Amino acid sequence: SWAAPYQASIAHVGGSPNALSQVRNGNYRDIDQFFNDGSYWRSRDRYAPHNVYTSGEKLDQLNSAKGYNNSEFTSFARADGKPVESPNATSVNINLSGSLYNTSYAYDKASNSYLRSMAGAPHTDREDGQITPNTVVAMEVGVEARAQNYDGYEDVKTTGSGKAYIFQNGTVATATWSKADINSPLKLTDESGKDVALNRGQTWIAAFTPGRGSVSWQ
């Protein structure tokens, strides 16, 4: 749902029954590993099922073969951010589904970015080191049980609106997230309804359900 407005290709290896039915309904650019095995591989130095890899080159070739060459979308407003003199949010904690997935961010003024940790340890990319987004967004979202909840899954409510917290430049701002329907872009607006400009570079977004998860900072 969040990827739909970007006309993005969805690269995945299987998924929940509901997610698969949505991705395969013809409204998405589905590049499932199950049907495009030559564009993915399994590494022997990691445990299955978390050992499937691909590459930008292979996905570019696959997209080109399928005619997925261009996308039209409305992006977030962007700005050239710089650290504030008196930061008020240099440590951010986002509690999600449990201790193995809870994340924290430590603000680094020198790079004006946030050093990400997960499960109490630095969250690293094997190639590039610790993940350091320029902006972190935490959104309050609801969940709902399936009408036919035979598989035990719940759906995150990706449309509608709710509260959001935007961390950048060492500060936090309260905003409203909104998404009118599945094909509409996700919007982040301030109390006057104006789009909030996000720093250029990486933005990491976390969605949590109040009562089950939380966000805090200091």
Question: Model-predicted segments: where are they?
Answer:
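A surface/extracellular/periplasmic glyco- and lipid-processing/surface-interacting theme
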Residues: S1-Q218
